[in-house]
Amino acid sequence: MLPAYLSNPFAAVFGGGKPIDGGRTYKDGRRILGDGKTYRGLFSGIFCGFLAGCIEIWLSMRGFEIMGIKMPTFGPNYASALIVVLALPSGALFGDMFKSFFKRRMGLKRGASLPLVDQLDFVVGAWFFTYLAAPEWFVSNFTTGIALTVLIMTPLLHLTTNIIGYFIGVKKEPW
């Protein structure tokens, strides 16, 4: 999940510039996504998440462990692993954009809180893209126990990192 977890903060750090929706509005008169979703943020977030995944692949191939826990393999071979580590951050950011689209439809402005949805949108997106790209790998690695752990720990990690982002000036809201 690290490539997915890292994509959003790096999108925020390196983002800015032209909004993906080009300032256009939907048929309800509201912005499609808003100014917070930019091409630079999307591509930098995917790139940084992918790079983190490549580092994990490299460490895994060398038998690296943290406190006795082996690094994930991400696939049976290098090409398969690269597909997974590209799907995770891509799905995370598209999940975040999907959520933004629906928040705009609900009349919620950029930065408005939508509890649990704000914390889990990128997980759902990452899982969806990864399942589409590598279904066998997904099913064998995201067991019920792992999935529950991710769903419980992610809101806590998300809140912690957003508070840090708020205090260092990267985020305008601490959620």
UniProtKB/Swiss-Prot annotation:
Task: State the top-level EC class.
Answer: transferase
One cellular-component annotation, GO:
plasma membrane
Catalysed reaction(s)?
A: 2,3-bis-O-(geranylgeranyl)-sn-glycerol 1-phosphate + CTP + H(+) = CDP-2,3-bis-O-(geranylgeranyl)-sn-glycerol + diphosphate
Q: Where are the transmembrane segments?
A: 41-61, 78-98, 122-142, 150-170
Pathway membership, UniProt: Membrane lipid metabolism; glycerophospholipid metabolism
Statement: the UniProt record of this protein carries the keyword Heme: no
Question: Which pairs of positions does the record mark as disulfide bonds?
Answer: none
List, alphabetically, the Pfam families matched.
CarS-like
Molecular-function GO term, any one:
CDP-2,3-bis-(O-geranylgeranyl)-sn-glycerol synthase activity
GO BP, one example? Answer: glycerophospholipid biosynthetic process
Q: Which cofactor does it need?
A: Mg(2+)
Q: Which HAMAP family match?
A: CDP_archaeol_synth
Functional description taken from the UniProt entry: Catalyzes the formation of CDP-2,3-bis-(O-geranylgeranyl)-sn-glycerol (CDP-archaeol) from 2,3-bis-(O-geranylgeranyl)-sn-glycerol 1-phosphate (DGGGP) and CTP. This reaction is the third ether-bond-formation step in the biosynthesis of archaeal membrane lipids.
What is the name of the protein in this document?
A: CDP-archaeol synthase
> What gene makes this protein?
carS
